[in-house]
């Protein structure tokens, strides 16, 4: 952020795109701002299909440079700002994974980081019943609350994959909590 030459910062991940309508809205907003930062909604594309039922994941991405205080978080870093936050109307496109070969390596990497954060936070010891509860909670959230099943095969794949992702994180936590660890035997 220190190297940015303009007064505003637009933070994007490599798999996010700014459509023309959003670009115009951003230009108009920074020309006459009402807030120090703005959230942008993401149009989720997973396995080449828009997921209507992913929800409206808003992310804080347009920030007046002087309002940015710091970044927080190890895995999904978030900007901490001073001032008010507004919402932009148009969506950015989030081109999530195109195939399973892209998705699995990221999940393996992130699950290690998430498990370490849970271990560092002194998560209660993992037991068999916790795995079942975690997986059922994830299923309920993705399938029932979000309604991803309505997005057809791609929705079901995402529901099952998110359950798998949660399982990996907590299985890694279980391994780390074991005494002696398997690597020491």
Predicted regions and their residues:
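Aromatic, loop-rich ligand-recognition surfaces of beta-strand-rich domains
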Residues: 16
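N-proximal low-complexity "stem/linker" segments adjacent to membrane-targeting elements
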Residues: 182-185
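Catalytic-site signature of metal-activated, phosphate-bearing donor transferases
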Residues: 1-2, 8, 19-180
């Amino acid at each position: 952020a220190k190297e940015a030459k303009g007064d505003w910062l637009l933070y994007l991940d490599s798999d996010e795109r700014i459509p023309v309508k959003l670009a115009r809205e951003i230009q108009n907003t920074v020309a006459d701002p009402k807030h120090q930062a703005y959230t942008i909604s993401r149009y989720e594309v997973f396995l080449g299909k828009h997921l209507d039922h992913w929800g409206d994941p808003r992310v804080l991405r347009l920030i007046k440079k002087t309002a940015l205080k710091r970044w927080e978080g190890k895995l999904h870093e978030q900007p901490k700002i001073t001032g008010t936050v507004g919402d932009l109307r148009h969506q950015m496109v989030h081109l999530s994974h195109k195939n399973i070969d892209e998705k699995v390596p990221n999940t393996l990497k992130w699950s290690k980081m998430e498990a370490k954060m849970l271990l560092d936070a002194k998560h209660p010891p993992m037991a068999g019943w916790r795995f079942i509860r975690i997986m059922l909670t994830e299923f309920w959230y993705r399938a029932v609350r979000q309604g991803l099943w309505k997005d057809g095969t791609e929705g079901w794949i995402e529901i099952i994959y998110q359950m798998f992702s949660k399982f990996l994180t907590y299985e890694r936590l279980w391994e780390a909590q074991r005494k002696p660890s398997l690597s020491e035997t």
